[in-house]
Regions:
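Short, well-ordered, aromatic-rich surface patches in folded extracellular/luminal domains
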Residues: 81-92, 96
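DNA polymerase processivity clamps
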Residues: 1-79, 99-213
Length: 213
């Protein structure tokens, strides 16, 4: 299993690998998740790439400290550095996710995600959006009556209700929804959201505490 958190504490990640990954044992963190996502999707690493776990001796034990990326011909390389166990434990100790009851659970399709991207582009000055239900429609809102604004139906015919109107970070949610895999999205009126991405190799839970606008 794996647990990580963005430096600004907007996203907590909990992952379970379906099979043991060689070299990935112990506790470590994944800083700058957007950089890791970019590296994993670079065309140079799509076929026959060599991605290895770098290890080092620390306090008498061998621990992973990063990933080394190298393309098939060995002329394109990158290194991604893990966060140490001590730093991870310090960062995570105050934000342990205790779990909530989910009021809405959906599996967004590519058309809904594309519409989300269009509204985000049209309202690029907005860093957060509000998720609320109107009847059986789950709607996302950008801006408010005092400025430019927009909204759209993200998913129709949902079960449950969201009435509080919590705000969520646009960039982080869009980044997660762009990841490859089967996606499930959950919202709680208590002020939490979780996006689960099943890549086939692992299942990643991206947990987002609500933000005040």
């Amino acid at each position: 299993s794996l647990e990580a958190m963005d430096d600004d504490r907007t996203v907590i990640v909990q992952a379970k690998f379906k099979e043991q990954v060689p070299g990935l044992t112990g506790t470590f963190g994944l800083p700058n998740l957007s950089k890791l996502n970019i590296l994993l999707n670079i065309d140079e690493y799509k076929e026959n790439a060599n991605i290895t776990v770098n290890e080092q001796e620390r306090n008498g034990e061998t621990v992973p400290f990063g990933l080394h990326f190298e393309n098939a011909t060995g002329d394109f390389k990158n290194d991604y550095r893990f966060m140490s166990k001590e730093v991870v434990e310090e960062k995570l100790k105050s934000v342990k996710f205790k779990g909530v009851n989910w009021d809405i659970e959906i599996q967004p399709n590519s058309a809904s995600i594309a519409r989300f991207k269009m509204q985000a582009q049209a309202n690029s000055e907005e860093t957060v959006f509000v998720a609320k239900t109107e009847g059986t429609d789950l709607k996302f809102f950008f801006g408010d009556s005092s400025t430019h604004a927009g909204n759209f139906v993200f998913q129709a015919n949902v079960e449950g209700a969201l009435n509080t109107g919590w705000s969520w970070p646009v960039a982080q949610v869009l980044s997660i929804l762009s990841l490859p895999g089967d996606i499930t999205m959950k919202f709680s009126d208590a002020g939490a959201a979780m996006i689960t991405v099943d890549s086939g190799m692992a299942s990643y839970d991206y947990i987002l505490p609500a933000q005040s606008k």
